[in-house]
Amino acid sequence: MQSTSKYNCDSDYIAGRNYNTKRTNGREELSTGLTNEETGVVNISDENNIFFKKNIDYVKGSRIGKYKLIKTLGKGSCAKVVQAEDCETGEYVAIKIIERTPKQLSDIRIYREALICSLFNHPHIIKLLDFFHTTEYFFLIFEYVDGQQLYDIILNKGYLDEDEARKYFRQIISAVDYSHRNSVVHRDLKIENILIDRNDNIKLIDFGLSNFYDADDLLGTFCGSLYFAAPELLLGTRYTGPEIDVWSLGVILYVMLVGKVPFDDENIHALQNKIKSCKFKFEKTISPEAQDLITNMILSSDARINLENVKKSKWTNLGYKNLTNNFMTLRKPIIEINKNILRALQAAMFFQFTDMERVLMQYLQICKGDKHSLEQTYWCKKPVVILYYLTMEKFNELNYKSIPIDIDTGMNTKSLIDITIEKQPIIIYNFVRFTNAKKNNNPYNLFFSRSVFEPEMEFLNMTKDVSLDSCNISEDENKKHNFPKIKQSIIKGLFKGIKIKNGDKDYVKNAIIKILLDLDITYEANEKSYFCSYSHSGVECHFKIDLYFNILLLEHYVVLNCLNRKKDNFKLVTELIKEKLEEIGDTSNYPENAI
């Protein structure tokens, strides 16, 4: 691959080149560097401490806890990665060493990476095995990958043929799809962060810039490598999350097939302007299908295709019978909250989510209502809910009640009030041990605890995925119930509502349902309101519709309330519905068989 002087390998993790799990006499050498089992603090000698500096190479005899260091695998701008041997098992691991800074934000990113990589269970995503810390360093112990970076493969070959690139790309989007479905956006996708193991399969690494995202909220942090960064990051606009990963995936595919980055310039400001323009050329002839896919991924955010369309594209599936497998389970509605799991998550995620119990209790009440309702699938995408599912999935169905590790081990109190930023590394250390306490060899995690999840629903007979796209509430199901109820009011709806000029309550409901069907808005009627989801041409919005009857004016009012922070999208949907209501007019213009 041709590269400019500015396009250098700067990964925090480099794959190892040699593979050997033969046990050495490391057990006899384990007399120093012992770990405090309650706090995760490793005792480091002054001599060994020198090695952990990013610019210092291997120092003979260095060790971290039970891990004997072998060699430096790579150095990045923020960390170094070393190969080490577990002196108890003889297995190799990769240890990411990050020097701690006074900035609290840097620590939070490390905590987040540790939590995500300890909870995720995907064949193409790197797994975190352990976590240690000192006052100066964090140590993230990952599984060891024998192989090389995708960067090195492209550099050696110049570019990849389309069949080879397609195989890697399908595995990459499988990993990214799994992340997105678990409400995590990577934000640093690039060829340096993709490893190819000795079996020619990929591993996605370095979740140091990742974050949880919510479709109802927006992110605003600039992250990642400039060459792979989406234009909205450079423009400083807020974003949901998955769309910036899709851009980066488009750049990765371009680099694999062409051998160059699509945007390049020695002047950083000129490079930024090129990226913002979204205009590039194909420097090498590739198939029309590949060109079409890349072109639709490297577009402005409002025109860019989503990951689902990438998965379904013609080029991605050439030669394959099925779409890529994201290795997601079908999650059942919960019927109770496991207090141990909740308490562990509250402690571990205290730096980001402070209302976990409230959110989970609200989700529990929704699950106790209609099974697989639109509202339940909507709430099931919330990061807090997903974190609960991910943690439960770490334990098999028989063992959740006897979870062996207390997340507060090493703390003087079990109260969340006692959690401080100083104690957070201890909590993260214990949480990683907590999630790895029960090893589960089943990569699919097919079954959940019958005591926590709905008992009467057998997994293998389930056909619905808990995604908003798969939940289509039929019109007949809604018409069976006389929902939502039209609430009588004097004030509500008068100022913010859309007035219905004529018609009784049946007419009003029929008009609303007709409009929702005409606009292809997925909806569900409950006792209080219509719960609605609209997604079209890049516009996505979740909202509810309440119906009121003013007892003084004898008029009906339709009130729309936005459920997320995408106000522009909500305004557009409101205008569409208002326009449709005006088109319908009074009852004389409304056909009796409209629905």
From Swiss-Prot:
One protein family per Pfam: Pkinase
Bilayer topology term: Peripheral membrane protein
Gene Ontology cellular-component terms listed: cytoplasm; plasma membrane
UniProt cross-references to SUPFAM superfamilies, sorted A to Z: Protein kinase-like (PK-like) (SSF56112)
Location in or out of the cell: Cytoplasm; Cell membrane
EC number: 2.7.11.1
Domain (Protein kinase): residue spans on this chain: 67-316
Binding site for ATP: 73-81, 96
Coiled-coil features, chain-numbered ranges: none
Alphabetically ordered keywords of this record: ATP-binding, Cell membrane, Cytoplasm, Exocytosis, Kinase, Membrane, Nucleotide-binding, Serine/threonine-protein kinase, Transferase
Catalysis: reaction(s): L-seryl-[protein] + ATP = O-phospho-L-seryl-[protein] + ADP + H(+); L-threonyl-[protein] + ATP = O-phospho-L-threonyl-[protein] + ADP + H(+)
Signal sequence, start to end: none
Entries under SMART domains matching the protein: S_TKc
Chief localization: cytoplasm
A single GO molecular function term of this UniProt record: protein serine/threonine kinase activity
Family statement drawn from the similarity comment of this UniProt entry: Belongs to the protein kinase superfamily. CAMK Ser/Thr protein kinase family. NIM1 subfamily.
Record protein name field: Probable serine/threonine-protein kinase KIN1 homolog
Gene expressing this chain: KIN1
